[in-house]
């Protein structure tokens, strides 16, 4: 079924990919992205592991109504989460050579 050394080479390749995957996962966990809402009036900085690091609110919004501010914060959080997902896909594509994961499968983090 496998030629001479074929199984050994396959195992080496699998180990190399696993090592690369671990490095990329560490890199993703350390990265930070910023999501925005209200044309940048609200900004949320989030890590690759979806932890919110910082929320910035333009002072002009503090005079407006509370509900609008809450909506903008939620929208900025959602934008940051979307950007994290996009960054994760890009980083993982570097490791997998662009192979797509089956529909519904998430990355292991």
Curated annotation (Swiss-Prot):
Cellular component annotations (GO), alphabetically ordered: bacterial nucleoid; cytosol
Region span, Disordered: 87-109
Record carries keyword DNA-binding: yes
Keywords per UniProt: Cytoplasm, DNA-binding
Cellular location(s): Cytoplasm, Nucleoid
InterPro entries the UniProt entry points to: YbaB-like_sf (IPR036894), YbaB/EbfC (IPR004401)
Matches recorded under SUPFAM superfamilies: YbaB-like
GO MF annotation list: DNA binding
Keyword Transferase listed: no
Family membership noted in the UniProt record: Belongs to the YbaB/EbfC family.
Subunit structure: Homodimer.
PANTHER family per the UniProt record, alphabetical: NUCLEOID-ASSOCIATED PROTEIN YBAB
Function description: Binds to DNA and alters its conformation. May be involved in regulation of gene expression, nucleoid organization and DNA protection.
Name of the protein: Nucleoid-associated protein Shew_2234
